[in-house]
């Protein structure tokens, strides 16, 4: 993560360490606000300023571009952890941006993901391990990439995922037999259990 610095200095360091293209995004934001795919120095300063603008805490993160496609897995629980189904994002552009997420422009979501059983199981296992490693509780959506060599790469956690009846998180839970009303009840129960019993976070 980077704090405010000279754009030319930041670009040079990112190019040397990450190669091109790379991504710049706020450390504290959602809905793909402030995320940019950087393919050269032109426009980088403006993209950097936009990422800082959407962060709120004055920090951004620069990431190496990963060749492959994105998958996600819904995870729920305190001490005991449940992994939902795995979904897959198909996009026409360089990343799943705001228009793709909320208008489904040039994007499609498949639940369950169009991957084989081995990758499916590995993705659910990685999601649960990430959930425990980050000491999560309640709910989280774990986002990952699948590379052409079938390697699963952890991307990030979304601790407040979209939560309409047709959003990704509820859809993945519905796929394993937890309908939306029950999901809400279960999450409320988890919150009450945590409040009554102390921290109640997933053990590593």
Question: What is each model feature region?
Answer:
Residues 26-27, 51, 64-65, 131-135:
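Short Gly/Pro-enriched turn/cap motifs at secondary-structure boundaries
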Residues 116-204:
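ATP-dependent carboxylate activation and anion-phosphoryl transfer catalytic cores
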